[in-house]
Amino acid sequence: MILYFHGFDATSPGNHEKMRQLQFVDPDVRLISYSTLHPKYDMQYLLNEVSRQLTQSDDPAPLAIGVGLGGYWAERIGFLNGLKTVMINPNLHPEDNMLGKIDRPEEYADIASKCVSQFREKHKGRGMCILSRQDEVHDNQAVASILAPFYPIVWDEEQRHKFPSLAAHLAEIKAFKEQQ
């Protein structure tokens, strides 16, 4: 089972396309949707929703995958649920770069301060990060410098921030999911 966390643009048709592509990794791909506007409520909702999805699956190695803001959530919710995680162009600091787009960006800082201390160290080896060199939204060199001590970084030379085509990385994602 793959739990797919969409990015900030929740209604983008690209989400359906990415989920369709991920079916080459695992036929059971489930959308984990959230409001994108109210982070404090999203955190509790996502924890409950992922827990519910996990009880409805017999997959011994479910995978959380998120793009952009979904990468932020996939990393945290994946860690808290003991899931392997793939982050694609993750937004690591929505409290800084979502000003004017969401109602309470400061809630992301609050969530970060309440998350398990040094959670990346504790999640080391259970995540993988795919970063685009053509990301027009985030400085992925900075993202890589933060995440590289904890997760392998896979660079993509062509995709933009929303990463419409996962095709070049599906084999890597599948191998990561199946790796013990």
Swiss-Prot record:
Domain of life where this protein originates: Bacteria
Gene3D superfamilies: alpha/beta hydrolase
Similarity-based family: Belongs to the UPF0227 family.
HAMAP family per record: UPF0227
Protein name per its UniProtKB record: UPF0227 protein Shew_1627
Source organism per UniProt: Shewanella loihica (strain ATCC BAA-1088 / PV-4)
